[in-house]
Design a protein with these regions (language model features):
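Cytoplasmic helix-loop-helix junction between adjacent transmembrane helices
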Residues: 114-152
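Juxtamembrane intracellular "pre-TM" segments in multi-pass secondary transporters
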Residues: 2-18, 194-228
Length: 349
């Protein structure tokens, strides 16, 4: 494709999206520029603190469990109190809990605060996705979710490379930088983003649409099927931040080496997400999710045969292609399955 063609494709990819979307996009980018804990927690615990890989796995599991628990409550808050208040509470709580985690030394305290960090950081997800669905036209949603995922990984590509060198100097500095950047996100939300929750009408509720509860969500067979399969794929992708750093550490590589390798994930997404999305946005999401799951399994399976930085980087490139296809497709499908009055609750998956 010519340079003019690339410019035209870029313009078409960002055209027609409302200003509120771009402020939400900016908040996401700022948040990911400060990302540190999720990327380097395993290395921090095993290399800096001297704990075992099994303990690092336990902490990662508690961090994930906190996210699962909080997403249920955050989904209800998003629908009941609004997207904006939920975002503000989640981001301020994340900033304080991440800073606190950097000062913890006792293994029980580390595990407990990691659980709180997981709760706080994941609480913003239902609100972000519901707000994005509110403010973007249905035909533009896959593109909008892809651009948001692109922002996540643009920030991640920069932060992961920088964080590797920060970790060589001070892990505590990484925790404090993430806390500060998360507070900056809260400021953007507070100053620039209005509430987007659709107004309830007299026809809602018993006289019109049935009210949406968590029980309604759990009884939705199609949605729960998507959630179950997405959970399995998410467990696989999580190995990029748990299994991969431990494998590289055991092979004698440094945190900076891991930061360089995992940085390929963000760089590839930044380069390929927009053109790939233009190719897949009108295709059957079921087929796309199947292809992405197979590609993810293949990519992570290759890690067993990696022994050099180049091969580790190659494995990251393979499963990153799966992530590029999976992320906007899965999020767009969830929004399609969710009723307007229950968007927050439906984003918990």
């Amino acid at each position: 494709m010519s340079v003019a063609g690339l410019r035209r494709a870029a313009r078409e990819s960002v055209a027609g999206l409302p200003g509120a979307f771009w402020w939400l996009w900016t908040s996401t980018l700022v948040n990911r520029l400060g990302a540190f804990v999720a990327t380097f927690m395993a290395l921090y615990l095993t290399i800096d603190r001297g704990y075992s890989a099994s303990y690092a796995g336990l902490v990662a599991a508690l961090h994930g469990l906190g996210g699962v628990v909080s997403s249920l409550g955050a989904g209800v808050m998003t629908d009941r109190f609004g997207r904006r208040p939920t975002l503000l509470v989640a981001q301020v709580s994340t900033a304080f809990s991440v800073a606190l985690l950097g000062f913890m030394r006792d293994p029980v305290a580390i595990a407990a605060v990691a659980f709180l960090v997981g709760m706080a950081s994941n609480a913003s997800r239902p609100a972000v996705q519901a707000m994005m669905a509110d403010i973007v036209r249905p035909e533009d949603r896959v593109r909008a979710f892809a651009l948001n995922f692109w922002a996540i990984n643009l920030g991640f590509a920069i932060s992961s490379m920088a964080a590797g060198f920060i970790a060589e100097y001070s892990y505590l500095a990484g925790f404090l930088i993430e806390a500060g950047m998360t507070l900056a996100c809260a400021v953007v939300v507070f100053v620039k983003l209005p509430e987007s929750r659709p107004e309830r009408t007299p026809g809602d509720g018993a006289a019109g649409h049935a009210p949406v509860s968590l029980l309604t969500v759990l009884r939705d067979g199609r949605y729960m099927g998507v959630v179950g399969l997405s959970l399995l794929v998410a467990v696989v992708f999580q190995q990029g931040y748990l299994g991969l750093p431990i494998a590289m550490g055991e092979a004698g590589f440094t945190p900076a080496d891991y930061g360089l390798v995992i940085g390929f994930n963000g760089v590839l997404i930044v380069v390929l997400q927009i053109p790939v999305t233009r190719f897949i946005e009108r295709r059957d999401p079921r087929n796309l999710l199947v292809v992405s799951a197979l590609l993810a399994g293949y990519g992570f399976g290759l890690t067993a045969f990696a022994g050099s930085l180049g091969v580790f980087a190659l494995t990251v490139c393979v499963w990153t292609l799966a992530e590029i296809v999976n992320a906007p497709t899965q999020t767009g499908l969830v929004v399609r399955l969710s009723p307007v009055e229950g968007r927050g609750r439906y984003q918990v998956g």
